[in-house]
Amino acid sequence: MAGLWLGLVWQKLLLWGAASAVSLAGASLVLSLLQRVASYARKWQQMRPIPTVARAYPLVGHALLMKRDGREFFQQIIEYTEEYRHMPLLKLWVGPVPMVALYNAENVEVILTSSRQIDKSSMYKFLEPWLGLGLLTSTGNKWRSRRKMLTPTFHFTILEDFLDIMNEQANILVKKLEKHVNQEAFNCFFYITLCALDIICETAMGKNIGAQSNDDSEYVRAVYRMSQMIFQRIKMPWLWLDLWYLMFKEGWEHEKGLKILHTFTNNVIAERANEMNADEDCRGVGRGSAPSKNKRRAFLDLLLSVTDDEGNRLSHEDIREEVDTFMFEGHDTTAAAINWSLYLLGCNPEVQQKVDHELDDVFGKSDRPATVEDLKKLRYLECVIKETLRLFPSVPLFARSVSEDCEVAGYRVLKGTEAVIIPYALHRDPRYFPNPEEFQPERFFPENAQGRHPYAYVPFSAGPRNCIGQKFAVMEEKTILSCILRHFWIESNQKREELGLEGQLILRPSNGIWIKLKRRDADEP
């Protein structure tokens, strides 16, 4: 009887404890929610003085105002920046998150030069499943340490080693384009992108994937599909929660793509690490380094040997993060710049003629591979690339998460705000670029650029978190463009309004880049 009574008492105690725990959890949840609402209301009130586009509603902000279609959304943002060009900055609420749009050089400088405002936007978290916490997505001390370790790997003398790869892949591209000579206009965007993918894969990993020959490979498909899925997820707040995302078809496909990408990279890292260990063993027994003496050096080789201030090497997971980051950042952006350059040259034959004259001065009629010295002499072509990136920056907007309260143009911007820099609008400021819609490479002649605000032009970002690979990118762009333009004359009849600009992770023409090719020797004007 006593045992039965004790059992009943124990059950009641358990029930009471469970009820208390549920009540406590519920109270904690309500308290947390109230704190968030109070913080949101405080931010709302404190940021009220900042100019905005229209009335924002509590909790949803301007979300109901935003276009859902990628093309329409980008066009909407650009229209806002044009309409409010006279304003120093512009506030938007995306749900409960405040954003300030910056498209004025003086105010962009405030954010980009700060050694404290270096945290990337929270939206970059959707890249983390693929890229981990590499150079693009990491913050704070990890980013500082990683940046310091990796900066020497992008020294120009090291980049020179990659020129042979760039020349080889550019020649493959030219052969692929031959079939379009004197034919109807065709979309060149995918051709250029596959060439850039081959280059970044071989320079980053030392692996020739032959994307230009086999664009249907599993890895190539996974790279493209992953970029698309990440952008789509960013636009759909209801898919932001990981557990919820995995309940949908998109989440399953995302996981499948990650497995393909990570397996490929892990295998390449393991294979190269084993080769390097074997080389060391050979040297240790006095047999030289024959196993890989003819193997080209890749970024991966440098990552396997780089150390921090304390002599620690990167783990294989760290290396995978950086290799995947190079893959993600190093092909789409460069391919976009080359495509936009071809489009603008095709629309501006007088500029193309100047480029051709410069190419003749440097190469004559030879089709030999470009050397580092050749590329240095292509100064006008470099101005063409710079002007292209002014009009069509590969990354049309990027963001920083404000890590502490700051003042911009006399307005208080609170911690937790997303500061969105819009190069597409910034580069069209008529104070620094008169007749901003005109294609004028001469803007970047030294005498014409003198005195221009240093933050009026930021195609590779600027400040502490500028693009570490910008020299690599320009080198690749000059190599590929010089190879194409030595063989072909470009024509383009597309009007800008026909391009269908879409500001995804990069600035894409949703309708493609359509050009005609003529053999330069025979048909050059």
From Swiss-Prot:
Protein name (database record): Cytochrome P450 4V2
Originating organism: Pongo abelii (Sumatran orangutan)
Signal peptide, first to last residue: none
Cofactors, names only: heme
GO biological process: fatty acid omega-oxidation
Segments traversing the membrane: 13-33
InterPro entries in UniProt: Cyt_P450 (IPR001128), Cyt_P450_CS (IPR017972), Cyt_P450_E_grp-I (IPR002401), Cyt_P450_sf (IPR036396), Cytochrome_P450_Monoox (IPR050196)
UniProt keyword annotation of Hydrolase present: no
Record keywords, A-Z: Endoplasmic reticulum, Heme, Iron, Lipid metabolism, Membrane, Metal-binding, Monooxygenase, NADP, Oxidoreductase, Transmembrane, Transmembrane helix
Assigned EC number: 1.14.14.79, 1.14.14.80
Alphabetized Pfam families for the sequence: p450
Family membership: Belongs to the cytochrome P450 family.
Lineage: Eukaryota, Metazoa, Chordata, Craniata, Vertebrata
A single GO molecular function term of this UniProt record: iron ion binding
